[in-house]
């Protein structure tokens, strides 16, 4: 028999900002957003990934709420810019994987787990179009770094994951010629019991206009 699934969502958002005049700018944002299970996860079927792993659907999955609080402080003076941000996310009964062994097979099944939350702090600072060696608007330099701590609380597991990441970008410009270089240590994606590794990124670019 076919099953019907009906979902109703409520997505409130609150934004506050305060101008500190010469001392910078403060911004706060709070929002609640729903996460709806995919139709593929809701099917009551099994799919073999290989000879060992089986993905099992779960028609009992429920929508869960994501709560996000973010606070940022920005400051600019002449060519200098800086931004400090703090963000906390909390997922209530999120849909995350459960992994267990059954009849010699590894079963992967999505379930509404207990909770997932993360706390992130990031600082960015840089100069834009600085004069160097008597050359006007010669140098643009930005650097940023952040730290994220995540907690994953499943029905039968509990994990904590820490990560640092950073990025550096430099650009020099002389008349119609510019040269840019950038390196990014990219964050990995952690959720449930899975860490997805991302490759670091390096880029160089020369331009003439």
Predicted regions and their residues:
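Flexible, solvent-exposed coil segments and beta strand-coil junctions
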Residues: 1, 6-8, 44-55, 98-108, ...
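Surface-exposed extracellular loop regions of Gram-negative outer-membrane beta-barrel proteins
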Residues: 1-19, 22-67, 88-105, 111, 136-147, 166-189, 199-207
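Transmembrane beta-strands of outer-membrane beta-barrel pores
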Residues: 2, 30-36, 45-46, 67, ...
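Outer membrane beta-barrel strand-and-loop segments of large Gram-negative receptors
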Residues: 56, 62, 81-169
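Secondary-structure transition into beta-strands, especially the periplasmic turns and strand N-termini
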Residues: 18-26, 75-83, 129-141, 175-178
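Residues on the lipid-exposed face of transmembrane beta-strands in outer-membrane beta-barrel proteins
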Residues: 14-18, 71-75, 86, 121-131, ...
């Amino acid at each position: 028999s076919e099953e019907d699934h009906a979902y109703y969502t409520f997505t409130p958002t609150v934004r506050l900002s305060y101008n500190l005049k010469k001392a910078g700018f403060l911004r706060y944002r709070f929002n609640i957003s729903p996460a709806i299970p995919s139709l593929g996860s809701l099917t009551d079927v099994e799919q073999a990934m290989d000879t060992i792993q089986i993905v099992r659907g779960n028609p009992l999955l429920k929508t869960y709420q994501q709560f996000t609080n973010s606070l940022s402080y920005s400051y600019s003076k002449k060519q200098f810019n800086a931004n400090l941000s703090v963000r906390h996310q909390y997922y209530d009964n999120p849909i995350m994987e459960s992994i267990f062994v059954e009849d010699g097979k590894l079963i992967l099944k999505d379930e509404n787990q207990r909770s997932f939350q993360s706390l992130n702090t990031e600082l960015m600072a840089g100069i834009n179009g600085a004069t160097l060696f008597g050359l006007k608007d010669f140098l643009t330099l930005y650097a940023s770094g952040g730290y994220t701590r995540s907690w994953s609380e499943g029905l039968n597991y509990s994990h904590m994951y820490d990560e640092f990441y950073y990025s550096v970008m430099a650009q020099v410009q002389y008349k119609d010629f510019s040269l840019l270089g950038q390196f990014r240590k990219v964050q990995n994606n952690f959720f449930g019991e899975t860490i997805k590794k991302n490759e670091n990124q390096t880029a160089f670019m020369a331009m003439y206009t």
